[in-house]
Regions:
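Cationic, amphipathic, low-complexity segments that mediate targeting or membrane/lipid association
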Residues: 2-5, 39-42
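Post-transcriptional modification and biogenesis factors for structured RNAs
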Residues: 11, 15, 33, 40-316
Length: 316
């Protein structure tokens, strides 16, 4: 099994273009160690790794034939505020009031403590009853972010293998630009210990709100207020109208599962055999720019070809 990557690489590099049914172009430049030619159908794979961090605003063709959804007038309507296991009814009420004041309507609670019939909820949510009435409860964070295209997580801690980090201002600009066309989510952790490592893997960006102290820990409703106000303040920012369509969170998860399954098929083992750590590294890598649908399609094709070639080489 250890010789598969070398064998497979030689097979791909020396495969005649006629077998693929596509035209081929030469690899230019003396720095490329590859022999032979690369089919045009394989070039989008290289494009993923050569793209600038904000490449999703570039003017490029869409090989999948899918078009961008039309922009909406109220991007804040597509912002989903998610609270993971909030323990205080007062915090839930305060967050509802923040959302009412900043024009955000969607509140999702993941496995919250009892709150609907608690007097403290109503006291703190003064004038925001419609936000509480429309609030949705789910059991897991996966359910809460399903259907969105971009997820921002908040934390006050640093750690290895965490996802791509940005300032809260930059993350809100990126989120509101995407919200003009797609649903986005801002995730807040528990009052006591925030988001777990397993929950952070569902986030494309991670932000820490700056503070005057070395170990800041804002109150939950205060953190929501700071992020919600930034979203409100930057809501005029938009993606370019010709930006390629983005993959949803659900499509992103399918890509990750397909890649991990393909690597397992060929006997790939990461450093120290820590597949959970490699899962986080892979997600961080794929999250450096919002994943476009065409990129997801290319990665699925690559994984399907790996399965095909592994069968042909009698690896299974």
């Amino acid at each position: 099994m250890g010789r598969l990557p070398k064998t497979l690489g030689k097979y791909l590099l020396n495969k005649p273009a006629e077998e693929t049914g596509t035209s081929a172009v030469p690899v230019h430049g003396p720095k490329y160690p590859c022999r032979g030619k690369i089919a045009r159908s394989q070039q989008p794979f290289l494009e993923i790794f050569l793209r600038a961090p904000l490449s999703y605003v570039q003017n490029m063709n869409n090989p999948t034939g899918r078009t961008q959804p039309s922009p909406i007038d109220r991007p804040l309507d597509q912002v989903r505020i998610i609270l993971v296991e909030p323990a205080s009814p007062g915090n839930i009420g305060s967050v509802a009031r923040v959302l009412k004041n900043t024009g955000i309507r969607q509140l999702v609670l993941v496995n919250p403590a009892p709150w609907r019939n608690e007097p403290e909820t109503g006291w703190m949510a003064h004038g925001s009853a419609e936000i509480l009435e429309a609030a949705r409860e789910v059991d897991t964070l996966e359910q809460a972010v399903s259907g969105t295209h971009f997820v921002v997580g908040t934390t006050h801690r640093r750690g290895r293998f965490r996802v791509v980090e940005e300032s809260h201002e930059a993350a809100c600009v990126e989120a509101i630009g995407i919200a003009h066309r797609y649903p986005v989510a801002i995730v807040f952790g528990r009052e006591k210990d925030g988001l777990s490592r397993e929950e952070l893997v569902h986030c494309h960006r991670l932000v820490r709100i700056p503070s005057a102290v070395d170990h800041p820990s804002f109150n939950l409703s205060q953190a929501v207020l700071l992020m919600a106000f930034e979203l409100f303040r930057t809501q005029g920012y938009q993606l370019r109208p010709d930006a390629p369509p983005l993959a949803s969170v659900d499509e992103f998860e399918r890509v990750v599962e397909h890649i991990l399954g393909s690597l397992t098929r060929i006997g790939f083992r990461p450093f120290n055999d820590d597949m959970s750590g490699f899962d986080r590294v892979l997600r961080r890598f794929l999250s450096r720019a919002p994943l476009e649908r065409r990129d997801a399609w290319v990665l699925h094709r690559i994984c399907s070809q790996i399965a095909k070639f592994s069968k042909r080489l009698s690896i299974e």
